[in-house]
Amino acid sequence: MRLAKPKAGISRSSSQGKAYENKRKTGRQRQKWGMTIRFDSSFSRLRRSLDDKPYKCTECEKSFSQSSTLFQHQKIHTGKKSHKCADCGKSFFQSSNLIQHRRIHTGEKPYKCDECGESFKQSSNLIQHQRIHTGEKPYQCDECGRCFSQSSHLIQHQRTHTGEKPYQCSECGKCFSQSSHLRQHMKVHKEEKPRKTRGKNIRVKTHLPSWKAGTGRKSVAGLR
């Protein structure tokens, strides 16, 4: 007695069952880390979530999660600035920096505040501005507990505790804790220079030779 061949439909059903079971196993494996990954291309996101940084710089040993980020970083060591501004010729390591720079020439301000409508060239400037409306002050001084809306303001404030004065006057050597104080101080020297110059001109003029009226002879002012 010859056994009948299995129908094609039954064969397909069996293969579909195996495929479904494999899919379930894969799904369980993909949920191992507490998240569902639909596509294999999402592996890079999983790696970043686990703080895995396999791409290491040979110059400074800094690590990165993506090879493209390492490639951009290595330009700092090589000094290669391949992204050049067509308007002024200034060059940059990254294309994103060039895009931000180009807004100086174009005047473009794509980041707009929803509260007051003021626009900004960079997203970081918008974030800082929005703290005016929200009152957020995320930067706190460890010494006195005072809070600030910008990190630069905290750095300036901390100098009141440390006594650091990194801004030095090139004319007299006096140091200041803030660049704005140095600029204000430099105005004193700029005002002094014209006064000294005018004084020298006056002294020179008093010693220039002049003609005595009616004598036809030269005389020097202040000399007999």
Curated annotation (Swiss-Prot):
GO BP terms: namely:
odontogenesis; regulation of DNA-templated transcription; regulation of gene expression
Listed InterPro entries: Znf_C2H2_sf (IPR036236), Znf_C2H2_type (IPR013087)
Q: Which residues carry this modification: Phosphoserine?
A: S49
What's the impact of mutating H129L? In a breast cancer sample; somatic mutation
Q: Which PROSITE patterns match?
A: ZINC_FINGER_C2H2_1 (PS00028), ZINC_FINGER_C2H2_2 (PS50157)
Report the residues modified as N6-acetyllysine.
Answer: K18, K23
Residues in C2H2-type zinc fingers = 55-77, 83-105, 111-133, 139-161, 167-189
* SUPFAM superfamilies the UniProt entry points to: beta-beta-alpha zinc fingers
* CC per GO annotation: nucleoplasm; nucleus
Supply the PANTHER family for this chain: ZINC FINGER PROTEIN, ZINC FINGER PROTEIN 771
This chain's function reads: Binds DNA through the consensus sequence 5'-CAATG-3'. May be involved in transcriptional regulation and may play a role in tooth formation.
Name assigned to this protein: Zinc finger protein 22
